[in-house]
From Swiss-Prot:
Cofactor: Zn(2+)
Transmembrane helix keyword on record: no
Any one Pfam family match given in the protein's UniProt record, by short name: ADH_zinc_N
Localization in the cell: Cytoplasm
Residues the record lists as binding an alcohol: T49, H70
Reaction catalysis annotation: a primary alcohol + NAD(+) = an aldehyde + NADH + H(+); a secondary alcohol + NAD(+) = a ketone + NADH + H(+)
Enzymatic class: oxidoreductase
Subunit structure comment from the entry: Homodimer.
Name of this protein: Alcohol dehydrogenase-like 4
Lineage start: Eukaryota, Viridiplantae, Streptophyta, Embryophyta, Tracheophyta
Length: 380
């Protein structure tokens, strides 16, 4: 390609401050260095993690200017030295948590947080040299990276350990959803909780991740799936995802866990906290059966808080854990999951509520912020 080895100037949506509208502007994108890949992003969507970072909810994670975004799909523009599994023109998914294949975590079954390329909201530069690949076009000042990916840009540079090559016949606009939210939810149901047939499930928060948990639970043969959300507009999509019972905490005269106990006659086997709320996490824990209950935390929490659980409560037979990317190893396990989805295991169309051009990204952010969107797919 003519651009190979050269700096590319392209459009990016840059965050300049907490809660400020993203600025669509020209940025410079350096060529990929050793073991890096430069990607032309074709589709990206907005996740609540992007929204949290944009709002600057956790002060320790604030870094500006910054290019957010991590759920996307695109085509390789060029590769750096040492990259052998990909080449220009390949279709790829950026993955916010990588897999080097060599560390003790990557070599261990059941673990997916690579020691070198695991997701780190504090990290704002490339792993290889501690520098950025983005610069302002006017004064050449550095622009920081986000979650290993920074997909709110027409071009981005990513470590090859965080890039998954996919079949060019796969529809990129659909499988882009599998680079974060859908995989996170379904994987939590399968890989982390390991939902068993005929079991009961409660899901707190019915955004994209929560609905993906429901899809995963239904695929595993759960007998009853309960959805909890303060926005009743989400209940219809919940039904389509397999949820049979709904609780709106604002309309209940009892605590949510008390209602769940009544519905299930003793609590669910599995609960999932997908709301990023410490109160929801507490209710999710108390909603599980005393003896076999498992709670999986998936929501992004705004600031560090202690778990709302007394240590002695864990002696009641309940357990609690958390999950990143649904426990999937992104490069070795995700390809089979993508194939399963495209063969009809999940309805990926369910998750795309809006489609907008890239320059309308601030409108997309507001739709998600107001609870009016599930996934807004941006076309670059």
């Amino acid at each position: 390609m003519e651009t190979q080895g050269k700096v590319i100037t392209c459009k990016a949506a840059v965050a300049w401050g907490a809660g400020e509208p993203l600025v669509m502007e020209d940025v410079k994108v350096d060529p990929p260095q050793r073991l890096e890949v430069r990607i032309r992003i074709l589709f990206t969507s907005i996740c609540h993690t992007d929204l949290s970072a944009w709002k600057g909810e956790n002060e320790a994670q604030r870094a500006y200017p910054r290019i957010l975004g991590h759920e996307a799909a695109g085509i390789v523009e060029s590769v750096g030295e040492g990259v052998e599994e990909m080449m220009a023109g390949d279709h790829v998914l950026p993955i916010f948590t990588g897999e080097c294949g060599d560390c003790r975590v990557c070599k261990r079954d059941g673990a997916n947080l690579c020691e070198r390329f695991r997701v780190d909201p504090m990290k704002k530069v490339m792993v290889t040299d501690g520098k950025t690949r983005f610069f302002t076009s006017k004064d050449n000042k550095p622009i920081y990276h986000f979650l290993n990916t920074s997909t709110f840009s027409e071009y981005t540079v990513i470590d090859s350990a965080c890039v998954l090559k996919v079949d060019p016949l796969f529809p990129l606009e659909k499988i882009s959803l599998l680079s974060c939210g859908v995989s996170t939810g379904v994987g939590a149901a399968w890989n982390v909780a390991d939902i068993q047939p005929a079991s009961t499930v409660a899901i707190f928060g019915l955004g994209a991740v929560g609905l993906a948990v429901a899809e995963g639970a239904r695929a595993r043969g759960a007998s009853k799936i309960i959805g909890i959300d303060i926005n009743p507009d989400k209940f219809q999509l919940g039904r389509e995802a397999g949820i049979s019972e709904f609780i709106n905490p604002k309309e209940s005269d009892k605590a949510v866990h008390e209602r769940v106990m009544e519905i299930t006659e003793g609590g669910v086997e599995y609960s999932f906290e997908c709301a990023g709320s410490i109160e929801a996490l507490r209710e999710a824990f108390l909603s599980t059966n005393s003896g076999v209950g498992v709670t999986v935390m998936l929501g992004v929490h705004a600031s560090p808080q202690l778990l709302p659980i007394h240590p002695m409560e864990l002696f009641q037979g309940r357990s609690i854990t958390a999950s990143v990317f649904g426990g999937f190893k992104p490069k070795t396990q995700l390809p089979f999951f993508i194939t399963q989805c495209l063969q009809g295991l999940l309805n990926l169309d369910l998750f795309i509520s809006h489609q907008l051009p890239f320059h309308d990204i601030n409108e997309a952010m507001q739709l998600l912020h107001q609870g009016k969107a599930l996934r807004c797919l941006l076309h670059l």
